[in-house]
Regions:
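A conserved helix-loop-strand patch within extracytoplasmic ligand-binding domains
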Residues: 129-147
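Flexible loop/hinge segments that line or gate small-molecule binding clefts
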Residues: 90-128, 240-248
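Hydrophobic alpha-helical
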Residues: 81-100, 166, 184-242
C-alpha cells in the first residue's frame, strides 16, 4: 500500500497496492509426500503475510484428468492466479490455456510445462540437479556394479530431466557403473517397496540407488528388511524428516534439496508482479547438496 494526500481533508489516505484482495489457487499433487505438504503450508503462510486470499487443492496424483478438473474448477469459481504442479500432458496444457485465455496467470512450480501458455516456472534446474546426483554417486561408487533409478513417471517433466542428467553424467564419466532400466513407482511407497524388494532378490550386483521422486520410505523399508543399509549408496531428493533421519542413520548418503519456502514465496511474487505490470521470468531455485556433515 501507499499513501497520498487527500486534498479535501488534508489527511493522508492509504491506497491498497495492486494485489490487495487477490485470490490465488494452488493446485498440487495429492499424497506426493512431505515436501508437497511443506510447499502448501509455505504458500498459505506467505499469502497471509502479504494479504492475499489463498485456496489449496490437492489433485489425484499422476492423473491428468483429475488435474484438468481441478484447474477448470479454479476458473469456474473465479480466481486471480493459479500456481500448479503440472503434468506434462496435452489435456493439462489445454486446461492451462483456458485459464490464460480468461486472463488468469498460471505459474508452474517444481516441474515445468514449457510448451504451454503458463506465465513462468519456479523450481530447480532439474537436469543440472540430476547431473549433480550422477556425479556424486559415480564418485561414491568406486566398485563396478549396477545403479537403480526410481522415478514417479514420465508425466513429471522434472523427473525426466533429472533422469536425463543423471544418466548422461554416469554414461560419459563412470563407465564402470551400469544404469538399470528406470523403475516407475508413481511416488507410491508400497510400489517402491515392492520394486526394491524384488530388485534386491534378483540382483546381487546392485551398488547404488537414486530416487528422483518421492516415497523414499518404501525403498528404505525394503533395504532395511534385506539388511542392505550399509551396502547400497543412496541418493534421494528433498530433505524431509525421513531423509534427514536417513542421513543421520547412514542409510542415505546425499539428498538433493530445494527450498520449498523460497519456491512458494517466489511463485506468489511472480503473480503479484504480473498484476503490477511487471514481466515475470522463470526463477531457478538453487540446488542444495545435503550430506550428514552439513545437515540443517
Amino acid at each position: 500500500a501507499m499513501a497520498r494526500l487527500d486534498m479535501s481533508t488534508g489527511r493522508p489516505t492509504v491506497i491498497p497496492s495492486v494485489p490487495a484482495g487477490l485470490t490465488l489457487d494452488v493446485v498440487l499433487a495429492q499424497g506426493a509426500g512431505f515436501a508437497n505438504d511443506v510447499l502448501a503450508r509455505a504458500h498459505s503462510d506467505y499469502c497471509r503475510k502479504v494479504g492475499l486470499n489463498y485456496r489449496r487443492t490437492f489433485s489425484k496424483r499422476m492423473v491428468p484428468g483429475a488435474l484438468c478438473a481441478a484447474l477448470d474448477e479454479c476458473l469456474e469459481r473465479g480466481t486471480d492466479g493459479v500456481i500448479v504442479q503440472p503434468l506434462d500432458h496435452p489435456t493439462v496444457r489445454d486446461a492451462v490455456a483456458r485459464l490464460t485465455d480468461a486472463g488468469v496467470p498460471v505459474i508452474g512450480i517444481l516441474t515445468d510445462l514449457p510448451s504451454s501458455t503458463r506465465l513462468a516456472y519456479v523450481g530447480l534446474d532439474n537436469r543440472a540437479a540430476g547431473r549433480a546426483a550422477g556425479l556424486l554417486l559415480g564418485r561414491l561408487c568406486n566398485v563396478p556394479g549396477d545403479v537403480a533409478l526410481f522415478t514417479a513417471g514420465g508425466l513429471y517433466l522434472s523427473h525426466e530431466e533429472r533422469e536425463a542428467g543423471f544418466r548422461s553424467v554416469l554414461r560419459d564419466n563412470f563407465q564402470h557403473i551400469n544404469i538399470l532400466t528406470s523403475l516407475t513407482g508413481g511416488d507410491d511407497p508400497q510400489r517402491n517397496y515392492e520394486m526394491t524388494r524384488d530388485l534386491l532378490r534378483m540382483n546381487d550386483n546392485l551398488r547404488a540407488i537414486c530416487n528422483v521422486g518421492g516415497a523414499n520410505r518404501g525403498i528404505e523399508k525394503a533395504l532395511l528388511e534385506a539388511g542392505k543399509r550399509d551396502d547400497i549408496t543412496y541418493c534421494a531428493f528433498n530433505r524431509t524428516p525421513l531423509t534427514r533421519q536417513g542421513l543421520l542413520s547412514g542409510l542415505f548418503d546425499v539428498v538433493i534439496h530445494q527450498d520449498m519456502s523460497l519456491a512458494a514465496r517466489t511463485s506468489i511474487d511472480l503473480i503479484v508482479q504480473h498484476f503490477e505490470g511487471k514481466v515475470p521470468i522463470a526463477v531457478t531455485i538453487p540446488t542444495e547438496l545435503i550430506m550428514v556433515e552439513n545437515l540443517p
